[in-house]
Amino acid sequence: PETLFHGMMPFLHDSPPNPRLLVNPGTISMRVSPELANIRPVILGAVVRGVDIDEEVIKRLMEHQEKLHFALGRGRKRASIGVHDLATISPPFRVEAVDRNHSFIPLAMEDEMTIDEILAEHPKGVDYAHLLDGMDKVPIIFDSKDAVLSFPPIINGDHTTVTTKTRDIFIDVTGLDIRACESALMLICLQLSVLGGKIESVRVNTCEGKEWTLIGSPIEHKVERSLVEGILGNPFTDDQI
């Protein structure tokens, strides 16, 4: 509802369109191993600070996340999102390719499980194991203390869960499609900014050796008139367009 509210404001209240997302420069970095190039090459991140979170906000955030997994992520293949309580983790972060015998405590579990056990026994692992078929190594996001934040695109670590006490959030988005990943990250950040959060960039050193940071500037897209008229259900003159 937050992103819908943002989009409808110019129509309902005659306010000027504001497609720009204010992104403040941050100090957190994330380094991606070159090994990820053939596993899950797109890995992005951002921080949102000062969010006032209650149970309803958590519910809406999780619902939004799953809708993006379905629509933009194509079942988490093109893009998947991880949301973490920043207070429980220690930057800088790094993303490594690990063997399937690596173990950690996944979300909603009490004991450590290996990667193979998660893929065979954890509900999310069973649902999405096919995305890692044929891969000897899988991606893991670590913090500076070697704690596991996430095993994308499957499951987060148990200790990073967002709760009503959370105020600062780290978001990771990983996948195969840069446009889908950037769009998913922008939409989650937009939702949290409407709730009062302040967005900060994360400096990502990609698997290709390049540097990426979130930029909140709008992107222009050219569309055919027929598409606009088809969506809105009316023909338009040149002046109206």
Regions flagged by a language model, labelled:
Residues P1-I241:
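RNA/tRNA-interacting regions in translation and RNA-turnover enzymes
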